[in-house]
Amino acid sequence: MSSRCKRCLNSFSEMNLKLKIAIIVIGFIHVSIAIARKSTDGVAHHRLVRLHTILITSTAMLSASYYIWKRVNFAITKLFKTLKSENELPIANSNESESDFAMNTLLPSPNPVGNRRLRLICFQDIAQALMMLFLFLSHIAMFFYYIFLGPEPNVIAITSLSFIAAYAHILIFLLIADVLFYSTKLIHSKVAPNSVHTYLKENRCYHILLALILGFIFMFAGLYTTHTDPIVRSASIPMKRFQSNSGNVSIALLSDVHIGPSVGRTRIAKIVELTNALKPDIIAIAGDLADGLVRDFHGAAEPLCNLKAPGGVYFATGNHEYMHGNVTEWFWFLENCNITVLHNLNKHITVNGQKLCVAGADDLYALRSNVPGHGMDLRKALGTCNSDSTNILLAHQPNAAKIVLSDSELSKKVNLILSGHTHGGQMYPFVPIVHLANAFVRGQYYDKSTDTYVYVSAGVNYFGPPIKMFGSCEIIFITMTQ
């Protein structure tokens, strides 16, 4: 047995009994759900996946919350200790007992210094209580995908989900502060006294409070973005297969609508209004329509039935249709709204004299979702798209676009790929991760070797926290030109 394994066993044996039992129970629950996920499919499978995701997130957040609480509580305690020391009362005179002096210190009195000290004690308790409430609401955020669901977001749900964004930013800023503190401490111990570390040590509580304040600033800035209208971003893409004696074709691209606990009917109605005002020839919904079941969010989704385009409204699945709802029920809902579902299918249309083949493939995640009959099949989706038409593919994840471009046969069939999924990162700290995980991140791309364009939308909405970077809630208006 390695020395690392021995250390782990020794650490476990040193834990108290209650902690050992808690770890064993949590481990047993995770293993049981993981086994159950392998043996189920369809709706039962996605419900287990959601439950397991919540448990994994909650388990990870316990450690993160302990870390945040220790740091912030240290800063609050030190700050109020400093303030109280500045308001200390004179030492009791010889004619006053210690108990009388203590009573006079704590009880309101004509002495303004004593009253200030009492108020500081109360403010410290209030600050600590508010921090505990913040952590609690952050922990229960994921449960609002199951409770208080309806046509419009619940106020408590919006607050809790917003706090998740502040929580993530605070955690990251605290980690950055600690990396700076301990790295300078290491240098300080090996070389001459380090003025940087001395400064960080003396002002550590203020840097922790700064991390807290910055977290909430980013949260409120993100709330402003998601509570204003999505911007319309225009793009012009030349199509070599277009007939010179015919007109241009416009497409309104909507991706990542994410109808759910933080996106309701009012928001969807506004998106529909803005989209219809563009008078597009085609409307494409490139996945991640909803984060729940039709029975919970049909009221919020109903305005989608008002989308109008002469060339039709088309939909292809994203990963969230498989993770958060019954995808078949959403297909029925959309078809009843005269929205064409492209379930590894294509449709031939003629718009403004131009021949088009609009295709849609199931999301990359579909196969892993264990939903019978679902899985990305690009050959089937593009099967009847011919070389004499301009072929458009709806593929939610940009990595699906990469698969198409890497295939010599498929790439000949596609002229334009429309994707979403990335949210452009959604929040600033996640931008590097999105760039690492996706072949394309945001905006217009051109692959010269295949003469194919890819457009990735940052999404019209957001997932989970109603927080997004400035200018990243967008409706894409593409004009395909000759």
Curated annotation (Swiss-Prot):
InterPro entries: Calcineurin-like_PHP_ApaH, Metallo-depent_PP-like, Metallophosphoesterase_sf. A divalent metal cation 1 binds at D256, H258, D288, H423. The keyword RNA-binding does not apply. Its EC number is 3.1.-.-. A divalent metal cation 2 binds at D288, N319, H421. The keyword Transmembrane helix applies. It is found in: Membrane. The chain crosses the membrane at residues 15-35, 129-149, 156-176, 205-225. SUPFAM superfamilies: Metallo-dependent phosphatases. It is a multi-pass membrane protein. This is Putative metallophosphoesterase F40B5.2. CDD domains: MPP_YkuE_C (cd07385). It is an enzyme of class 3 (hydrolase). Pfam families: Metallophos. It comes from the Eukaryota. Its main location: membrane. One of its GO terms (molecular function) is metal ion binding. GO terms for cellular component: membrane. Belongs to the metallophosphoesterase superfamily. LOC643853 family. Keywords: Hydrolase, Membrane, Metal-binding, Transmembrane, Transmembrane helix.
